[in-house]
Amino acid sequence: MLDAAGVESQVQPADIDETTVKATHHGDAASLATELASAKATAVSALRPGDWVIGSDSLMTVGVRRFDKPRNRDEAAEHLRTFSGQAIILTSAVSLVRDGEVEWTHADRATLHVRDLSDTFIESYLDAEWPEVGYCVGVFRMEGRGVQLFDRVDGDHFTILGMPLLPLLGALRARGLIAA
């Protein structure tokens, strides 16, 4: 996403314990996504002194229930059955960190209205998309067949893809990291 926007970047996975962060967090989805994004960026920042590091994270909720990435195909199918006919909330956050200091954060949410999904559709969808969608919190990739899950989408396209890109670009411009 950053490269497509003309922002040079390198991907470096962060070594953080997301399970512990999620278990001990007591705020809303936006604050949890922000905490996870910041923890990831801070962990990578420790390995890259002087560099600006971007971290991001996304969470999916239906009502008060939070969904994590499915552990296997059966769990992915169960998630899709739960999402069927529901409005799901996708919260994405981004954090900008330098030398271990969180300099800027932003969180945004989108509402995705899942159409009624038949078991036949779910199976054929997973036949075509598994295991790739297993790495996605909502078991979909909007830029692929996942778009067929929805009747309507309310929210920013980039937030749905996993990062509130436009606010991030503004933060990068404000710090002179990309041309204004």
Question: Residue locations for each model-derived region?
Answer:
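N-terminal G-site helix/loop of the GST-like fold
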Residues: 1-13, 174-178
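Short glycine-rich, Thr/Ser-proximal phosphate-binding strand/loop in the N-terminal lobe
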Residues: 6-24, 102-109
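Anionic-ligand binding patches
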Residues: 24-180
